Structure formats: structure tokens, C-alpha cells
Amino acid sequence: MSSFKEFKIKWGMVIDLDKCTGCGACMVACQAENNIAPQPDASNKLKSLNWLVVYELNNGKPFPEHDVAYLPRPCMQCGKPSCVSVCPVVATDKNEEGGIVSQVYPRCIGCRYCMASCPYHARYFNWFDPTWPEGMDKTLTPDVSVRPRGVVEKCTFCHHRFMQAKDKARVEGRDPSALRDGDYVTSCTEACPNGAIIFGDFNNPEHRVHELHKSKYAFRLLERLGTDPQVYYLSRREWVRRLGDNYLEHEKVKG
């Protein structure tokens, strides 16, 4: 896999799975913020579309040892994204400001190579033009484009909020390249009632995620693939960390 340069700013998430209750508030907030049209039947995998999905995990043991965890899965904004490597028209790329993997919809030709290459299944193809119930079209976020039929879309870490935070910093006479912790947060971070999703700059010591992602209980999904995800998870439960990278029984798990 080709290498990618390091960025001064590295936006990322730390998601505490021991705090997540699987309520789905993050999913709803993501849909509302990013103009994702609601579907009457969410089980219809052809028509339903979610940039953020919450998965239920369990340890496979019977009661009373049975245990459950919930895992929110946004785009991992990989440091070495396989989706970028395979796109024939450069419709997806690593953003220079923060390392977010961008998606340029007018360039996308709908080949879906990026979907096939993503090990996290975090990309979605628009088979249909989006439609909204009467009145809901007036509540769309003006800074987020509505994606047409025939293109691939995904989580962007609410990049429009990043642009807004930089504009606000300029107005206040601050350096837009040195945002404070909390100046720029994603909609899912804002909506989580338990504070399970923490967002910030991994490279900034003043941001909470700077220390959290170094915890001995931190892990990343399928880390051994070498994609360098910018989303970390926390859990004190070993079985949860073991599932994160498909560890075998004899392999030692971090933490």
C-alpha cells in the first residue's frame, strides 16, 4: 500500500465503548446534519443509507456471563486509505488540512472501486435520487451538498463544521490552523448523551484525544491491515478489544 505524508493537524475520534449504550442518537444526528434522506424501511439495504452505523457485539457466552457492547462505525479517515489508491478519477483524496478523506461528488463516476477496497464497509452508493417527506426538504443543512444518484458517499467528519470553525477563528482574530479543543466537533460527538464520542486533533496536546488515543485500552479496527485509521476505540473489556482485530485465542491483546 502506498504511503501518505503526515499532517500537522490530524483530526480523529476516540469512542469509549464502555460508555456507549447503542441508543442511536449519533446515527440520527449524522443523518440530519449531512442531508441523508430518511427511509421508511431501514432494513432495506438497497435503499437505506447511513454514514454512521452502530453495531451490536457480544462475547458469545451464555447467561450469566453474557456481555454486550455497541460499536459506532464512522469512516475511519485512514492515514493510508485504500479507497484513495484505487480511485481512477481522484474523486477521493486525503485532505491537506487535518487528514480527512474527502469525496468530490462531481468527479465520481460510480465505479465503486473504493467501496470494494474499503475494509470497513464505510462507503455507500446512491442507487436512487434522494427524496424527503413534505416539509423536510426545508430543514436541510445549507453547507452540505445533496448527493445525486450514481455517486459514492461517506462520512466526512462533518467537514463543513471545520470550515465554519476556521471562519469563526479568523473573525475573532485567532489562528485558524490552531483551533481550540471543542471549536470543531462532529454532529455525532455533539449528540451523544453519554459523551462516548470524543473528537479533536491527535497532534495537539491541548485536545483530549491527544492523551486518550494513547491509553493502554485503546485499539483500532483491523489495525493489522496497515490502513492507519484515525478512529480509536476504548474498552477495558478484553473480549471487545480482541474482536477489534480478529485476534486468535493464543494471541496476546493490548492492555
UniProtKB/Swiss-Prot annotation:
[4Fe-4S] cluster 1 binds at C20, C23, C26, C30. GO terms for cellular component: periplasmic space. Its EC number is 1.97.-.-. Keywords: 3Fe-4S, 4Fe-4S, Electron transport, Iron, Iron-sulfur, Metal-binding, Oxidoreductase, Periplasm, Sulfate respiration, Transport. [3Fe-4S] cluster binds at C155, C158, C188, C192. InterPro entries: 4Fe4S_Fe-S-bd, 4Fe4S_Fe_S_CS, ET_IronSulfur_Cluster-Binding, Menaquinone_reductase_QrcC. [4Fe-4S] cluster 2 binds at C75, C78, C83, C87. One of its GO terms (molecular function) is 4 iron, 4 sulfur cluster binding. [4Fe-4S] cluster 3 binds at C108, C111, C114, C118. One of its GO terms (biological process) is anaerobic respiration. Transmembrane segments: none annotated. It is found in: Periplasm. The keyword Translocase does not apply. Binds 3 [4Fe-4S] cluster per subunit. Binds 1 [3Fe-4S] cluster per subunit. Residues 11-41, 66-97, 99-128 form the 4Fe-4S ferredoxin-type domain. Its cofactor is [4Fe-4S] cluster; [3Fe-4S] cluster. The Qrc complex is composed of four subunits: QrcA, QrcB, QrcC and QrcD. Can form a supercomplex with the [NiFe] hydrogenase HynA1 and the tetraheme Type I cytochrome c3 TpIc(3), its physiological electron donors. Component of the respiratory Qrc complex, that catalyzes the reduction of the menaquinone pool using electrons transferred from the reduced periplasmic cytochrome c3, and which is probably involved in sulfate respiration. Is likely essential for growth on H(2) or formate since the periplasmic hydrogenases and/or formate dehydrogenases act as primary electron donors for the Qrc complex. QrcC is an electron-transferring subunit; its cubane iron sulfur clusters form a pathway for electron transfer between the hemes of QrcA and the membrane quinone pool. This is Menaquinone reductase, iron-sulfur cluster-binding subunit. It comes from Nitratidesulfovibrio vulgaris (strain ATCC 29579 / DSM 644 / CCUG 34227 / NCIMB 8303 / VKM B-1760 / Hildenborough) (Desulfovibrio vulgaris).
